[in-house]
Design a protein with these regions (language model features):
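Bacterial N-terminal signal peptides
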Residues: 7-19
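Flexible, solvent-exposed loop/hinge segments and secondary-structure transition points
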Residues: 22-160
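Positively charged n-region of N-terminal signal peptides that target proteins for export
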Residues: 1-5
Length: 160
């Protein structure tokens, strides 16, 4: 009988220990909300419209999941996939896609051998407190125009 009571108490103690350690493993993190993505996209679209450009804007969260995709009227369909690639590349490498494009331009083409990479200017990581919480990608114009519109989206984060 004492052995059964001991086993029961030991089992309960282990259950409590595992339950408390499991809950301690959850972390809180900031991520890109739909409202934030819409604010960024609106600023990016305004920048494109001001310059008579047509663009696609993609915003992804910290897992590379699509939060927002917007395609301005008249923008070529191919820009959808390019904008997604730029956003995911900026997220995965935690830097603007222009940095990867520059690496290739400097004669180091090994970057293009990496899987799932779009090494073309126009993708920017979204930073909060020094951590990447998502990314924005734009496509439809020249690479510089794409980045200008993506940057306008990032700048909207600092506006109240």
């Amino acid at each position: 009988m004492k052995l059964k009571v001991f086993a029961l108490i030991l089992g309960m103690a282990l259950s409590i220990a595992f339950a408390s350690s499991a809950s301690a493993q959850f972390v809180e993190k900031k991520t890109v909300s739909l409202a934030l993505a819409k604010k960024m996209a609106a600023a990016s679209e305004a920048e494109a419209a001001k310059n008579n450009w047509t663009m696609v804007f993609v915003i992804v969260d910290d897992g590379g999941n699509l939060v927002y995709l917007g395609r301005m009227d008249g923008t070529q369909i191919g820009s959808i996939e390019v904008a997604q690639g730029k956003a995911r590349t900026a997220l995965n490498f935690k830097r603007p896609t222009k940095a990867l494009q520059d690496t290739i331009d400097m004669g180091q083409p090994h970057v293009i051998t990496l899987d799932h990479i779009t090494a073309v200017q126009g993708g920017l990581p979204i930073l909060l407190d020094g951590k990447v919480i998502g990314a924005i990608g734009a496509s439809g114009g020249t690479s510089a125009q794409d980045e200008q519109c993506a940057q306008a989206g990032l700048n909207a984060l600092n506006e109240k």
